[in-house]
Amino acid sequence: MKKLVLMAVFALSVLVASAQPRLFVKPNEPLGEGKGIHPGRVAWVHSPGVATWDGETSLWVEGRWNDQQKADAMVRQAVMTVAGAKSPKAAWKALFKNFNKTHGKGNKGYKKGETIAIKLNMNNAITHRDTIELNSSPYVTLALVRSLINDGGVRQQDVIVCEPSRAITDSIYDKIHREFPDVVFIDNLGGNGRVKCEYYPEQIKYSVDNGKMARGLAKCIVDADYLINSALLKTHNGPGVTLTAKNWYGATDINLMWRKNAHNGISPDKRKGKPGYKTMVDWIGHKDMGQKCLLFLIDGTYGSRHVNGAPAPKWQKAPFNNEWCCSIIASQDPLACDVVGMDLLIHEWPEFGSFNYCDEYLREAATIPAPATGVTYDPERDGKPLTAPLGLMEHADADRNYTKLELIYVKQ
């Protein structure tokens, strides 16, 4: 393992200004308040060789293209770095205790019988068959489950791997079920060892009239004691990026076929940057979504410039140098986690037009109770609006430096 000074790693050529997207927040202008044991800390673990698919042969999920040992080490290192602990066991203990302390449950750790739901991003899976399209990595998911059980002391039957709106593919189910047969799997289809997702209606009522946006939430999400948001590192034609905040959409009672779903309040005004209510702020601030999350994780072992299809292309700029991103980003702070992922994507593909104003949801969430839109964010519509920033957001400068956000880069 090798820790490198970020400025040395990212000695990059200056990009042409016109190629840069228009954003609401300038570099090194932090907004909000950091969350976590170490407020605003983000772990970036980079392990070249964890993903090696050639982009053409068969499916990227096959074992010959992925290194499980590296994935295991990455997840354990990410958890240790976020918690500031010397072992994965100590890290999980610290994370559970910090969560419970900040949620009014006392200074205690994980207790047997408490359930932990891991929300995957299987947006490109509508059957249980493996696909060439990019979804949650079977290797990162197994690594996360292994660490929770073997390091965190969580019982198998208390771990729920879920994707309420899509299908959990065979490569994920088979790999985990073979090793941990009591882990529960819940997806949109059910069958083949998976439990079909059920929903509680009218759980998220939104802070404004949000049209036909889904308002039900998966029972496995609502009933869990803790959540882990395991997202992907991808661009998106609508909101610009799809990271941990967008991943919550899949916890609502949307249709398996995405064209049948509403997407109100998700995308920014890409042409003029006119401020507008952002649905993702309600998801981050909801008591049974972002506010119940123990850990935010972005799986960037492949990473992609495309929301659909196979992962592509390989990453060209340093430190990737024509390889896959081979990275995991993790934090207790939902805004800090997403802004680091966003900065990585923007740095690699600055010409992507949908990046314009993609940071609006982060600005809104970081400036509660006085966001630029003037919206009073009250996700449950219970008359108890959010009264404080939901985290810390700050864009890096050209040398990948932050001033308040603490980014720790670890190369393995």
Model-identified regions with their sequence ranges:
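General helical structural elements
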Residues: 6-7, 123
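Sec/Tat signal peptide C-region and signal peptidase I cleavage site
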Residues: 15-19
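Extended, low-polarity segments enriched in aliphatic/aromatic residues
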Residues: 20-112, 123-131, 135-412
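Positively charged n-region of N-terminal signal peptides that target proteins for export
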Residues: 1-4
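Bacterial N-terminal signal peptides
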Residues: 7-14
